[in-house]
């Protein structure tokens, strides 16, 4: 069945056409079944819409506007390209070549005359082609043939392809080209590499066996390309032979293959910069050489020298080497100039002066601030180095004056040079008013007051003038400020005896003790000889001192107790570490609370200050705090504010170390007085102290009593008045005075008593002396001692029921100290101490009972945690709540204050650790807390062991008593069965197999 489609754009008819020729008339087509024909209407047959008048007007106006705009654009472009320089530039670019430069492609412009010739040829070709297409008769007729086209319609092959047909492109199989490998030996390969390096003047490096390297570079000398070896003298080393001919001969032969000599090279042409150049020896016929190729090193006595030739020591220093000093100079210049340039890049640098002017500016500024004849001359540089500030300023000023004309010329040409030179001239300015400065020195020369020294420093700075540094000007300003403050305060200090005006500086010189200077009392080493005094001093050491047994780091003797506090000795520092870092750590003390100068620091007599019985101050009136005092072995240390004197203790058979017993620290004062006692009176002196003075003073007496005892002793032994005292520190916080012995003091920050002799100390015995310090006791102090005692009492109370009940009733804050350790808290909860304390205090004090309730709840939570860090974190999280509950409860109780201090430290540690963790840092507090917890656990285990030991002892007593009662009442034939029962009972109680019972003679049973 045939079909016809209307509207398709195809005009081809499908079907069968008669074989006969067809005329121009209609063509008959036989349509068979299945044949399809498409009929397309012509333009005349299609409907054409007629536009309205308004649309025509709009179209006409828009077309006119578009045409006008296009003409304007064309005119702009025409005017732009009509310029001759623009057309010439485009013409050279159009006929340029695309070349490769490095890794980039760029257009190389053609010369203008070449471009014009090519353009003229192109226009001529266009004109010829146009003439050919238009058939312009040139008047030449050539006979030929005419080709006619048959216009008759004929049948043709019809394709089924539509207008959307797109042929599939042919896939071309790419054949992989096989890599061609060059077959050549190593020498040929090296020669080819040399030719490549020679073409681009590149650097090449030869590496032989080991670390031997030879660096060479092809350099351009005129039109010739010559290889140059990098020699040792280019790095500043002078060698007798720079190249070994046996090693580098083959390398030189390879380098020669890349050499290109394009012009004649004469002997006089070889100069600086030719160092390492490889030249043929035939170029230098006047100078004989050993090798065919010459490696230029320099000239010696006018003759060229080969780098392979070996020179003598004298010739090595005299040869003129031809290194390229200009390249080295500019290399160093470029390196430091680019490194030291300013960082404020607020503009784009553009060159405005030539290189010659740049060199003049640099040379002018350099000679203005660093005047030398040659920069490389060490003598010129050392002259500037060794010159003082005054000499250097004078030298700079002289140089500027000598070359004033040159410098003035540069000032006028360049404003920057003028600015820099003005700054340099300002440095030579000095203070001309020397007369007034010398008058100030004359007035203040013999004055030692603080203000006089401060004014002297200000005058010295003004006298130096430009020589003074910025630090000296800053210090002078500070000193002037201090003088101004003193003057302002001095106007208001009209009241006599004001604390603000109190000054009690330390003695700058040591006291003189005649007993220590007498030659008859010194041995050949200059040490004090005790004589009979040493034999009688045993009354002190046997009754009031105890022997120091080495071991355990002397921890047993570090803490000294007193009624108000404890004192920590530095005896542990006798163990000297051999590590520098640990040795430096031993010089760090533990500072106590540093108090300012108050009324408690001074002593008065009739309203006036008694300076020897007061605390030492600094120049500005602030308190002078004690430093760390290092320990010594077997010494008596005397001297307070001045330099200390070390006196060997009396010699004994074993040379043991002694430390004063608790409460008898003041014996060190009497031992120091014994140094000044006559040998025939030493026995009476020591017996009087042992039998009369010490029983009268007892332990921890007041300073007033000690001073009175010293007065009594000086009555019987007047020579002891000049005896020097040991160091005495004042602790105003605990109302205590510390007599420091040879074992020093780790605690720092105390006030220092100025009294240096016994006669000065006796002032404290006077009733006319008004001073708080004379009522202070003699003792010492160590930080955290109260906390250690509380922890010790808590651990003992956990395993001692009676002591636990006492703590609950009398001092509940010790039980609250269990917050410092999860181990102590859990053990206290397990023995029922928290529950008993809560029931006891809930009736007496609600807040304390609430704290014990909180402790019980916290102990249950802590016991559920598996890790120590989790337990400590739980306790730290509740520290703030405990502090809030303790607020306002028994504020004056020292135990309560110690507990609050511990909780505050826990809270602060928790806050710091959380802040560090949030910022991404890791602290080491977890490890330290674990180690501390292990110590608490170990101390708790020791208490548990003691409790078990006591239980075993009581159990043994029970077995002994029961056996004795049994054998006294029952028959002895049951002894075997009783032994067996005892063994079973002991196994159940102690969980250990005790073995067969060994009967004792007394009670017929052995002790467990």
From Swiss-Prot:
Keyword Transport: yes
Organism phylogeny: Viruses, Riboviria, Orthornavirae, Pisuviricota, Stelpaviricetes
Protein name: P3N-PIPO polyprotein
Family statement drawn from the similarity comment of this UniProt entry: Belongs to the potyviridae P3N-PIPO polyprotein family.
Pfam families: Peptidase_C6, Peptidase_S30, Potyvirid-P3
Keyword entries, A-Z: Host cell junction, Host-virus interaction, Hydrolase, Inhibition of host innate immune response by virus, Protease, Serine protease, Suppressor of RNA silencing, Transport, Viral immunoevasion, Viral movement protein
Coiled coil (residue ranges): none
Organism: Peanut mottle virus (strain M)
Motif (Involved in interaction with stylet and aphid transmission): 374-377
